């Protein structure tokens, strides 16, 4: 996949969670709401490279504004109760309007103001609560007021940095009080939002696994049939839960949450609301991160169709969607369509005053030109982007390093090795500068990209050294199992190329175990990794294990790529060789016969690869007629040598 990024770069995670917690507390406790408050910045936020451009970094939670809560109204015995809760998830754009103002008169509904996700209105109430006939105060009212007070204290502790653990304890106590105050188990919106706050504090403490059950509980409480308020409260919880799953690398669970949230949003706002389009883009980004590109393209097309329906062509939101679509098309090899979308995105951003961000799209445009072998145009696009980024971001910005890497790749492809090495050195200088503005993930991504160029220049040991550094960085980051698995798989190929077959086997084994744990057992990447591990087994004379790996890879690649794809054909050739080695001649002949037939049709009979496999097939047929006279032969003649490179794993 293209090197580069997700979204905006959020380097200070602690500050991010501080503002997230404050925003969630505001949802509960502040009277005023505003539909101008910034939401979590999605792919189209710009400001740095796109989600895909950073080699599928994990979904980061977005920035939220600072707020004040529980303001005194001048009367000690009164507190402002929320007229509406701005139920904004820390993850997605929840700029949802429950009811337009012109509908208020028709429905007779009062106290419904325009907000991002307005989920309910309440009036001021005396702190003492309601008096019962016996003169005692209603306990549930006291519980609610105490819970709000505890949330205020928790917010202050988080803001001051005094004790986040104490803040967590207070939010748990507040949640229990809200739960106890719920009438006859009836869902309480304040309770739901308190759980959202509690989960956000857990995330600030990097206790993601503890946050997940809290958020799961928060999405179980709302009853969608109760109305828009409950539906949108559930939407907020689902999006926050999806983000938390992403932080621990559970992308499939994350996508399920986003999808369910999107369906709720559609039900409330309608299929063609522009805000639904923004959530579509968010889901598409997650699908890209999970390497589910076909689904990501479909969701992104839905977002673009919403822009067409809204009659707002060339908007910033459409530019974001086209940028994402361009990168999806580029990843799928549809370079012409990718170029079209990226050029339109660049024009739209320039028209909307986003000149500083055009540089990032110019980088992607250069990628498309490079893929189309239009090298002169690619150089122009990269140089234009490089000049703009140096001016806007500075000489040592990671985005500048990213363009250096692309230029190094371009010059290496065109045989200008000296220029390629020079640009690699410039990029390394940036990533090894210990610049605090560069996040660890950006450094790891940059080192990984440089290693690919080093490998192509036959500097294999240097490539492994860079990958080891990247691996060490990612090992300390949550939710990076897929990235770590990808690096390990690439290292496995390099070890194989160096003849270090045991090291290759061990790194592939580690990579595959991580891919299984993250649910990536049905991806093309997983199938290719299995095939490569099988090759390492062949070299270690572990033929039976190699057969098992090849057969598993066969099932995956047939489903994901089809029986005529080059990757599948190479796997067939390897499996045929392994079958031959263990005496399963009929199976070997059947597979190799299919490979030869397809190769002749696609490549012609004079192609060297076709000729080699025809000779192998002829030998197998000869041996099948005289099994007792079989001669031992090296396993190296049984495998497809074309698949012993790492290109397929990038």
Swiss-Prot record:
Family: Belongs to the kinesin light chain family.
UniProt key word Transcription regulation: no
Keywords: Repeat, TPR repeat
Repeat positions for TPR: 192-225, 235-268, 277-310, 319-353, 359-392, 401-434, 444-477, 485-518, 527-560, 569-602
Region named Disordered: 104-141
SS bond partners: none
Comp. bias intervals (Polar residues): 131-141
Gene designation per UniProt: KLCR3
The protein's name: Protein KINESIN LIGHT CHAIN-RELATED 3
SUPFAM superfamilies assigned: TPR-like
One Pfam assignment: TPR_12
InterPro entries linked: TPR-like_helical_dom_sf, TPR_rpt
SMART domains recorded: TPR
């Amino acid at each position: 996949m293209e090197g580069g990024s997700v979204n905006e770069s959020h380097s200070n995670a602690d500050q991010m969670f501080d503002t997230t917690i404050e925003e969630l507390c505001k949802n509960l406790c502040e009277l005023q709401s505003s539909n101008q408050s910034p939401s979590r910045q999605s792919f189209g936020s710009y400001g740095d490279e796109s989600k895909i451009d950073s080699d599928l970094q994990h979904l980061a939670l977005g920035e939220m504004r600072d707020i004040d809560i529980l303001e005194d109204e001048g009367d000690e015995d009164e507190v402002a109760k929320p007229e509406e809760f701005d139920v904004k998830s820390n993850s997605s754009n929840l700029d949802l309007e429950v009811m337009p103002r012109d509908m208020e008169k028709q429905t007779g509904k009062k106290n419904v103001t325009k907000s991002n996700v307005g989920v309910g209105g309440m009036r001021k109430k005396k702190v003492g609560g309601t008096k019962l006939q016996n003169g005692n105060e209603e306990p549930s009212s006291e519980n609610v007021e105490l819970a709000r007070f505890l949330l205020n204290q928790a917010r202050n502790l988080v803001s001051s940095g005094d004790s986040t653990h104490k803040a967590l304890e207070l939010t748990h106590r507040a949640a229990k009080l809200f739960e106890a105050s719920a009438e006859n188990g009836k869902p309480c919106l304040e309770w739901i939002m308190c759980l959202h706050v509690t989960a956000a504090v857990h995330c600030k403490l990097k206790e993601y696994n503890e946050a997940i059950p809290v958020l799961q509980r928060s999405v179980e409480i709302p009853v969608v049939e109760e109305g828009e308020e409950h539906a949108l409260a559930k939407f907020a919880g689902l999006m926050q839960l999806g983000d938390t799953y992403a932080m621990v690398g559970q992308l499939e669970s994350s996508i399920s949450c986003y999808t369910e949230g999107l369906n709720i949003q559609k039900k409330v706002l309608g299929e063609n609301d522009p805000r639904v389009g923004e959530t579509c883009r968010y889901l598409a980004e997650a699908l890209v991160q999970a390497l589910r590109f076909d689904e990501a393209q479909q969701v992104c097309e839905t977002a673009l169709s919403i822009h067409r329906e809204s009659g707002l062509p060339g908007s910033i939101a459409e530019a974001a969607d086209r940028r994402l679509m361009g990168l999806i098309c580029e990843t799928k090899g549809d370079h012409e369509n990718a170029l079209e979308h990226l050029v339109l995105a660049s024009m739209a951003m320039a028209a909307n005053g986003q000149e500083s961000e055009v540089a990032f799209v110019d980088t992607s445009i250069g990628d498309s030109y490079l893929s189309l072998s239009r090298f002169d145009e690619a150089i122009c696009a990269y140089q234009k982007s490089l000049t703009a980024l140096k001016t806007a971001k500075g000489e040592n910005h990671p985005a500048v390093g990213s363009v250096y890497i692309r230029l190094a790749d371009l010059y290496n492809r065109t045989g200008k090795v000296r220029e390629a090495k020079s640009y690699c050195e410039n990029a390394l200088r940036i990533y090894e500068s210990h610049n605090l503005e560069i996040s660890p993930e950006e450094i790891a991504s940059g080192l990984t990209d440089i290693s690919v160029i080093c490998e192509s220049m036959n500097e294999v040991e240097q490539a492994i050294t860079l990958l080891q550094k990247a691996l060490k960085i990612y090992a300390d980051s949550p939710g990076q199992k897929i990235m770590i698995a990808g690096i390990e798989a690439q290292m496995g190929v390099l070890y194989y190329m160096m003849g270090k077959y045991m090291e290759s086997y061990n790194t592939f084994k580690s990579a595959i175990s991580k891919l299984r744990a993250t649910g990536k057992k049905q991806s093309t990447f997983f199938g290719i990794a299995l095939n490569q591990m099988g090759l390492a087994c062949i070299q270690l004379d572990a033929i039976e294990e190699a057969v098992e790996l090849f057969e598993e890879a066969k099932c995956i690649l047939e489903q994901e790529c089809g029986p005529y794809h080059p990757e599948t054909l190479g796997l067939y050739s390897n499996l045929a060789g392994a079958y031959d080695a263990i005496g399963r001649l009929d199976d070997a002949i059947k597979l190799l016969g299919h490979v030869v037939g397809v190769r002749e049709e696609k490549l012609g009979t004079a192609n060297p690869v076709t000729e080699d496999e025809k000779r192998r097939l002829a030998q197998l047929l000869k041996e099948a007629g005289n099994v007792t006279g079989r001669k031992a032969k090296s396993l190296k003649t049984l495998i497809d040598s074309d698949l012993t490179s790492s290109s397929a794993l990038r």
